[in-house]
């Protein structure tokens, strides 16, 4: 994602973190919101199914509830989907799958790394 376009996206979105570890994403543009949410919330339902988080849509906000790691992954996926929608004018199922796959794989790789206390040279 280009840095300039990311700045534009983050200006269009507002992130609100709650004490119960949920994240609310507020959209300022209803057209973008409807594109990201999808017809009959289909994109959010797919994202919810793939991520294992609970995703709610109300007004101009998307609310993500789950554990903190999954919430952040879904938040980044929604930012990615917003970028895709603004660039292409539409979203496909592959965009939804790839948005989460990219971030889930990164998180999985972070979890699999172990820190080394010693390095032995031979």
For each predicted feature, which ranges?
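Short amphipathic alpha-helix segments
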Residues: 32-49
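Conserved short hydrophobic interaction patches
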Residues: 43, 50, 80-84
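N-terminal assembly/transducer modules of large multi-domain enzymes
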Residues: 49-51, 58
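Interdomain "pre-motor" coupling segment immediately N-terminal to P-loop NTPase/helicase cores
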Residues: 56-119
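Glycine-rich adenosyl-nucleotide cofactor-binding module
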Residues: 122
């Amino acid at each position: 994602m280009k840095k300039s376009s990311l700045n534009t996206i983050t200006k269009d979105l507002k992130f609100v973190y709650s004490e119960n570890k949920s994240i609310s994403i507020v959209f300022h543009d209803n057209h973008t919101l409807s594109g990201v949410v999808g017809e009959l919330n289909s994109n959010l339902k797919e994202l919810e199914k793939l991520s294992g988080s609970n995703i709610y849509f109300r007004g101009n906000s998307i609310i993500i509830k789950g554990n903190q790691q999954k919430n952040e992954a879904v938040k980044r996926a929604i930012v990615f989907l917003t970028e895709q929608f603004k660039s292409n004018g539409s979203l496909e199922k592959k965009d939804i799958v790839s948005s989460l796959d990219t971030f889930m794989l990164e998180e999985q790789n972070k979890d699999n790394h172990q820190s080394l206390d010693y390095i032995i040279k031979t």
